[in-house]
């Protein structure tokens, strides 16, 4: 599947404003990998307090964006359509650079394990092809 717009994303993910952190999907191989994007704007509510004079996207929200991208890849499988993805854990999270208003986050997630309704995805977030964050995300599908 390629080039999913926001209408397509809303049919796959259960997340809605203000927690929907995916704007576009470039490509997805169901159950295997995905490349998605989040456009970061100054209008994001979290910038009011993080930080008022130097807005920086919270690292936990970058991880959440990676998790949502990975969820699209898994929820695109027929057996998981319409289900809810839940965080089960995070390993090896690293934050390398700040993400600020005007940035476009490129979210790449590859499933490294998928057994039954649980799995692990390796996520890498980039801005201008430079790694800004990475993590292994464990999840369960309910």
Swiss-Prot record:
SUPFAM superfamilies: Thioesterase/thiol ester dehydrase-isomerase. One of its GO terms (cellular component) is membrane. InterPro entries: FabA_FabZ, FabZ, HotDog_dom_sf. Keywords: Cytoplasm, Lipid A biosynthesis, Lipid biosynthesis, Lipid metabolism, Lyase. Its EC number is 4.2.1.59. It is found in: Cytoplasm. GO terms for biological process: fatty acid biosynthetic process; lipid A biosynthetic process. GO terms for molecular function: (3R)-hydroxyacyl-[acyl-carrier-protein] dehydratase activity. It is an enzyme of class 4 (lyase). The active site is at 50. It catalyses: a (3R)-hydroxyacyl-[ACP] = a (2E)-enoyl-[ACP] + H2O. Pfam families: FabA. It comes from the Bacteria. Involved in unsaturated fatty acids biosynthesis. Catalyzes the dehydration of short chain beta-hydroxyacyl-ACPs and long chain saturated and unsaturated beta-hydroxyacyl-ACPs. Belongs to the thioester dehydratase family. FabZ subfamily. This is 3-hydroxyacyl-[acyl-carrier-protein] dehydratase FabZ. The gene is fabZ.
């Amino acid at each position: 599947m390629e080039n999913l717009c926001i209408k397509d994303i809303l049919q796959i993910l259960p997340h809605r404003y203000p927690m929907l952190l995916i704007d576009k999907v470039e490509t997805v191989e169901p159950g295997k990998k995905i490349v998605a994007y989040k456009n970061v704007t100054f209008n994001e509510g979290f910038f009011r307090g993080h930080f008022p004079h130097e807005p920086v996207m919270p690292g936990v929200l970058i991880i959440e964006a990676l998790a949502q991208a990975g969820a699209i890849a898994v929820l695109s499988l027929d057996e998981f359509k319409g289900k809810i993805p839940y965080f089960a854990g995070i390993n090896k999270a690293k934050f390398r650079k700040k993400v600020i208003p005007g940035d476009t986050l490129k979210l790449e997630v590859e499933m490294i394990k998928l057994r039954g309704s649980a799995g692990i995805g390796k996520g890498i977030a980039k801005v201008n092809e430079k790694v800004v964050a990475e993590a292994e995300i464990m999840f369960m599908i309910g």
